[in-house]
Amino acid sequence: MTSSFPHRRHAVRRPLAALLGLLCAGLATAGPSIYPEGTTRLDPARAWPSFVLFTGGDQQARLIDLDGRTVHTWPDVGGFASTLLDPALVHGERGHVLVTLENVDGRGVDLVPGRAGPQVSRTIGELDWERQVRWRFGALAPEGLAQQHHDWARLPDGHTLVLSNLRHAVAGFRQHDILDDVFYDVDESGAITWRWVASEHLEELGFTPAQLALIRESDNADFLHVNDLKPIGPNHWFDAGDARFAPDNLIFCSRNANVIAIVDRHSGHVVWTLGPNYPAIPRGTAGRRVPRPVDQISGQHDAQIIPAGLPGAGNLLVFDNQGEAGYPPVDLPTTGGSRVLEIDPVSRQIVWQYTAEDSGQPAWAFRSTHISAARRLPNGNTFVDEGQSGRLFQVTRDGDVVWEYVNAYPRLGKDPVTGKATANHQLYRAQPVPLDWAPAGTPHSETALRATPAATGAPR
C-alpha cells in the first residue's frame, strides 16, 4: 500500500504493505517519498461499517468499502467532490450521486478573476447506479455556466441546493469584478427558483468597519471563499422555539473570512454567526480541556449541524484547518495542527474536540491547512477527511483511530520546473455512506487490520 515516486504501486491489502504505511503515517503531512496507500488500520468491532465515496486524482467518483476495495465507480466526473444521495430523497432509489458532468477552461475568458487557468463547472448533475443522467443544472444558470463549487445538497422537496460563483461588479470593491458566492435553489427542470448573494449581506456577518474596508480593498476577488452550504435539518433547538435553527435555514462558512453563519431561508437575513473574531487558543493543556468557550478558528471547512438521531445532535461540527485566513490574517501556532470541533451553537462552548494529541501524537501530525471535512457517525465515532494528505479515518470520542485509509488514486503529473513525475494524494472531501444507500447485494467487507504500538509509535 505504498507509492514511490516516480512510480506508484497498486494498493494491495497485505500485512507488510500495511505496516509500511503505518510507519509512514506520522510523516504524511511532511510528504514522505514512500507514501502509504489504501487501508492501513481497521478495528471492525469499533469502526462504523460503511462505504466511503470520494473523487480521486483519476477523476472517478469511487465507492470503497472499509477494506479499501472499490465496489463501484462513476468515471469522468472531475470537480470538487461527489455526493451519494439518501434514497429517501430520490423516491427510494439507491446509488444516485451528484457529480460534475462538464467543465470548461477559465483561461482567457475571465470567468474567475485573479486566478490563472481554472476549471469552471459548466454542468452538474445526478447520475444513477448505471451512470445514467437523471437531472442536470447549468444551461439555465447565468452565462449558461453552473459555476458550482465546493458543495450542494438535495432537499426534501426534490429541489437541489447549489453553491456557485457569480462574477459581477459590486460598488465599493477595489476589484472591477468580484468572484461572489451565490446560493441557488434549483428545481427538477434545472431552473433557479431562489438565490442569495453573499456580497449583499456583508454587514450582517459580524465584521468591524475596519475589516469591511480590508475586504473591499482586497486583491483577492474571491474575498469570502465560501466552502460549505447545507440545510440545518430537524433539530431540538427549533423544536424548543429558537427560530434561528429552522430546518430549512442554511448554514455556510467562509474560509477566507473565518465566519460560520446561518441564513434565514425566508427573509434572507443572517440570523446567527460564529466569528469572524475569536479569542486566542489557550496555551498548553488548557487548550485541550472541554467544555470551554470557542477560541480561534481559522480557514475552516464543512460546518454543519449534527443531524437528529446521531450522537451530539443539534451541535455544530466543523473541521478547523488552522490555515491562514482572516481580515487581517490571524496569528496561528508555528507548529500547530488542525482540529475537529463540536460546538454547542447556543452556549458557544466547545464540548468535544479532536487533535493529534488525543491519539498520542504531536499536534502537527494531524494537519490540513485547506480542504477537508468531518462527519458524526451513528455509533458516536467521527469520520475525518484530512484532505491535504488524502488520509481518511474514523476516530472514537476518546481519540482512538479505529479505521484509516490513504487515497490510493493520487493525481499524477509533471513538475513544470524539474520535469519530474509528481503525485498529489489530496482529497477535497470524502463521504461516509450507509451500507443500505447502495443497491442491495453491493459487496463489502471489514477485515481486521491491527497496528501494534511499536509500529505506530503511539499507545492504543
Kindly give the residue locations of the regions a language model identified:
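Intrinsic structural disorder/low-complexity segments
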Residues: 10-13, 17, 269, 374
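N-terminal secretory signal peptides that target proteins for export/translocation
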Residues: 1-12
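Bacterial N-terminal signal peptides
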Residues: 15-26
